[in-house]
Amino acid sequence: MNSKHSSDFVVIKAVEDGVNVIGLTRGTDTKFHHSEKLDKGEVIIAQFTEHTSAIKVRGNALIQTAYGEMNSEKK
C-alpha cells in the first residue's frame, strides 16, 4: 500500500440514528464498495486506501479529519 494513503483517516460520529457512510472506489468508474449505517453516538474510523478514493456521509454526523472538523446535515 502507498504510504500516502495510510495516514488519511476520517472519524465519523453519528449525531442521530440512521447515518450512512459509503466508500467509493477509484478508477474510471466510481462505484460503491462498502456501506455502514450508524446509530446515534456510534463512531466509525475510515481510511482512504488504494481502493477507496471518496467517502460519502448521508445524515447528521460530525466528521473529523486532519484538515478540520465539519458537520453533515440532513436533507
UniProtKB/Swiss-Prot annotation:
<dbReference type="Pfam" id="PF02081">
    <property type="entry name" value="TrpBP"/>
</dbReference>
<comment type="similarity">
    <text>Belongs to the MtrB family.</text>
</comment>
<comment type="function">
    <text>Required for transcription attenuation control in the Trp operon. This trans-acting factor seems to recognize a 10 bases nucleotide sequence in the Trp leader transcript causing transcription termination. Binds the leader RNA only in presence of L-tryptophan.</text>
</comment>
<keyword id="KW-0694">RNA-binding</keyword>
<dbReference type="GO" id="GO:0006355">
    <property type="term" value="P:regulation of DNA-templated transcription"/>
</dbReference>
<dbReference type="InterPro" id="IPR023558">
    <property type="entry name" value="Trp_RNA-bd_attenuator_dom"/>
</dbReference>
<keyword id="KW-0804">Transcription</keyword>
<dbReference type="GO" id="GO:0006353">
    <property type="term" value="P:DNA-templated transcription termination"/>
</dbReference>
<keyword id="KW-0805">Transcription regulation</keyword>
<dbReference type="InterPro" id="IPR000824">
    <property type="entry name" value="MtrB"/>
</dbReference>
<comment type="subunit">
    <text>Oligomer of 11 identical subunits arranged in doughnut-like structure.</text>
</comment>
<dbReference type="InterPro" id="IPR016031">
    <property type="entry name" value="Trp_RNA-bd_attenuator-like_dom"/>
</dbReference>
<dbReference type="GO" id="GO:0003723">
    <property type="term" value="F:RNA binding"/>
</dbReference>
<protein>
    <recommendedName>
        <fullName>Transcription attenuation protein MtrB</fullName>
    </recommendedName>
</protein>
